[in-house]
């Protein structure tokens, strides 16, 4: 199962899993894109691909998906879907911030609860949690996202300690900036313009690195120089020093 499978890391994870011979369940909001991806992966790799179009920020839709997955034998769950916002929390749309929390944390938790009992009972399985280096430190002007990823980071590493003895792998992916291709100047977002090209990772590289790490049951995989430096900063530099510096940088994304 791959959530957020219509683009970016999610699409790359689906492609890499198909290349490795896995049948797939693709989850995202945009059904038409998922159907096109499913046809392409089946044609290229000969695997069975099922589409479950779901808005994971909708509690009822998430509950329905979890009920469906709980009755299936799921070997790997890639909890990838997520969104981010930038700018002062007081100036952001409150409902969108709530939707971000539902998507980035509650849906991740619900999906994990849906599949982890069967994995433990079976004695095999793997969960890839897409957290973030942003979850390692306070980030003004990215508050909801950073807080949501702190939840995912902690959930992943805590759960890994619970299920390792049962043969279940749990790996946290804490990526930095990722993109499928370099945009043209006209298409570049503020993030593309602020973050230098050499700090970006390709979604294909991140997907392969993540699945290799999950296979080895690594606790955390941190691809890229920026994410590695943020992980170090979050662990060793006092938070009262990093917060204002990082906050000024992230404010640019909201402008």
State where each predicted segment sits.
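Active-site helix of classical SDR
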Residues: 112, 148
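Residue(s) in the substrate-gating loop at a strand-loop-helix junction
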Residues: 132
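SDR active-site lid
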Residues: 162-229, 236
